[in-house]
Amino acid sequence: VEDKFGLSWQLILGEDNIKQKIIPSFLFVDKAYGKAEEAMKFYVSVFKNAKVESIYKYPDNEKAVMYGDFTLEEKLFAAMDGAGEHGFKFNEAISFVVNCDNQEEIDYYWNKLTSDGGAESMCGWLRDKFRVSWQIVPSIIPALLSDEEKAQKVMQAVLQMKKINIAELEKAY
């Protein structure tokens, strides 16, 4: 199902005991076809509280994932490989926010997610090697933006950064 904004939704009828109603789902298509399993294993290796829950392969293609799911920090995600031309690839229209309690966490997630061909962007944004967009954000941001006058200085600092530096934000505050 596609909504009026062009966002695709997959509706699944399941058991009543489902863990969460909305499950972010990655569809690996075109040049990314066949990378769903690799991506699931990569994300599970990056996040500390994570595991692959299930992987079901296509009977006629053991390299492609018909459906797989995995958890990251107790949140369920799904991944699939889709054959054929789909005319899209991952982009910044959808991103995942990782809230970090300190600079060590920011550095950890930034370095892991940009490894092996990922790309840095501005303001705490990055793309991993599968072109999935992430925002690596310090959990202190709401507090630093709560004072309207100081918020402008903090945002000016953020706009100059790729990876967020908490000490620099606190200095700007």
Tell where the protein language model's regions lie, with residue ranges.
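Conserved beta-strand and immediately adjacent loop positions that scaffold enzyme active sites
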Residues: I23, Y67, M122-C123
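Short glycine-/small-residue-rich flexible loop motifs, especially phosphate/cofactor-binding loops
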Residues: K41, Y67, W110
